[in-house]
């Protein structure tokens, strides 16, 4: 079910494009803890960036073999059970459901969904990393199977990427728009493995010889390079083409970072498992903090993964069994000094 709220705000922002062209990023499961946030007791940043809009809980069953933009309902109503990953391209979403062990293709505009592929990559309290291209090709990291799989728009396997020596537990995948390479983040080695389109390993970033990462939970391409969520270091690290560190984001402002997305303007969206809030950064500045624990609009049970497309941020929430859609304000509407 798609539940609308604040549609006037949606129309006002609907023409604003901030698309990065990436399907989404997810976070590997952090260790259970209940620490206090850095600077606890200080003022909470004003949210001038994110507004709750829709809540997607499922859709009407449809035929997967129909073109993504021409689907029609053909069966019963389906609901998500435990969505742990999300990617988006226009009205089409790919949602990884850990409890249903299914990768769903959802048409947001038509309120339909179809089983796209079997999903074996995530379990309880573990996010999934997937990305969808403009031709609806989909890449997904499957740590339990030690590989990344690419599907075509009809859910057929195109290729598998595997390097068990350097990437025994792949938890994040990022593909640039030209698709000349495929980058895989590994939770076991805390390094990024760069593959060519045929599946051959080209090089390693942030690896054992020159460690710049303590862990990898999620990653995305953005304006400055490759953005990597390092959950153990409680920050986002931006890497250049050779693996050099270009920028550190969220230092001393994140506790249990989980889920990552970056828009074209360079704003970085990070889900924090400590307080179930989405924190928005521009460089080192915390622009906004939205959400909190709960089941109402704009509240989250557990933020598993984030994906941004246009002026919409998609949030996979496993506990509330839904994908929330947040309106993203254009950079011109950011209020200076919103964050302390």
Place the predicted regions along the sequence by residue:
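N-terminal secretory signal peptides and thylakoid transit peptides that target proteins
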Residues: 1-17
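Blade-level signature of beta-propeller repeat domains, shared across WD40, Kelch, NHL, RCC1
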Residues: 301-340
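Beta-rich, blade/repeat-based domains predominating
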Residues: 76-89, 121-134, 164-178, 210-224, ...
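Short loop/turn segments that connect beta-strands within beta-propeller blades
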Residues: 107-111, 152-156, 196-200, 240-244, ...
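Conserved beta-propeller blade signature
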Residues: 93-95, 137-140, 181-184, 226-228, ...
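Bacterial signal peptide processing site
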Residues: 26-29
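A short beta-strand motif characteristic of beta-propeller blades
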Residues: 68-76, 112-120, 157-163, 201-209, ...
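Short loop/turn segments immediately following the C-termini of beta-strands
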Residues: 98, 143, 187, 231, ...
